[in-house]
Swiss-Prot record:
A zinc finger (C4-type) spans 57-72. This is Recombination protein RecR. Coiled coil: none annotated. May play a role in DNA repair. It seems to be involved in an RecBC-independent recombinational process of DNA repair. It may act with RecF and RecO. It comes from Vibrio atlanticus (strain LGP32). One of its GO terms (molecular function) is zinc ion binding. HAMAP family: RecR. The lineage of its organism: Bacteria, Pseudomonadati, Pseudomonadota, Gammaproteobacteria, Vibrionales. It holds the Pfam family Toprim_4. The gene is recR.
Length: 199
């Protein structure tokens, strides 16, 4: 079926979203045009405003419309000297939802990947190095993803911490709550055994 140029353009634009293929984009476009034009206009306005006004925190690099985000400006967050290093702002949301952490963050916006040409400065490790040199950080909690790249990134940052005599710790990896051992992959089970603790 031949569609209008503007409709094709809308569907192509929707495909930039993760997990949205041609069929999903077509379904979304038709829904907005046929059933929810007001919602479509609100979406367009919110996207336009977010794309122009949301930047990065000058301390932790997460998304914010201010120069410094609400976490970094919170005096209670600065007292404990902890900084949790994560790969994306979505990781902050996940950790905050637990209610178990009350320190500050540093967002890498990715991980080291020499094969893809992503080096230390590409993920802000020069900025992290500067923050470590300031002397107000006593512990770095490495919460990068448990992938090969995430582990390499965590190791690199741990070396950086050692150079500045700052404690570095890695979040635990292992068997998920409610998981069955026979269904857990070997690497995860190995991490669980190596990271065991007394009860």
């Amino acid at each position: 079926m031949r569609t209008s140029h503007m409709l094709e353009h809308l569907m192509e634009a929707l495909r930039c979203l993760p997990g949205v293929g041609p069929k999903s984009a077509q379904r979304m476009a038709f829904h907005l045009l046929q059933r929810d034009r007001k919602g479509g206009l609100q979406l367009a306005e919110a996207l336009s405003q977010a794309m122009t006004e949301i930047g990065h925190c000058n301390e932790c690099r997460t998304f914010t419309e201010e120069e410094t985000c609400h976490i970094c400006t919170n005096p209670k967050r600065q007292d404990n000297g902890q900084i949790c290093v994560v790969e994306s702002p979505a990781d902050i949301a996940a950790i905050e939802a637990t209610g178990q952490y009350s320190g500050r963050y540093f967002v890498l916006m990715g991980h080291l990947s020499p094969l893809d040409g992503i080096g230390p400065s590409d993920i802000g490790l020069d900025v992290l190095d500067y923050r470590l040199r300031r002397g107000d950080i006593t512990e770095v909690i490495l919460a990068t993803n448990p992938t090969v790249e995430g582990e390499a990134t965590a190791h690199y940052i741990a070396e950086l911490c050692n150079a500045h005599e700052v404690n570095a710790s890695r979040i635990a990896h292992g068997v998920p709550v409610g998981g069955e051992l026979e269904l857990v992959d070997g690497t995860t089970l190995s991490h669980s055994l190596l990271g065991r603790h007394k009860i």
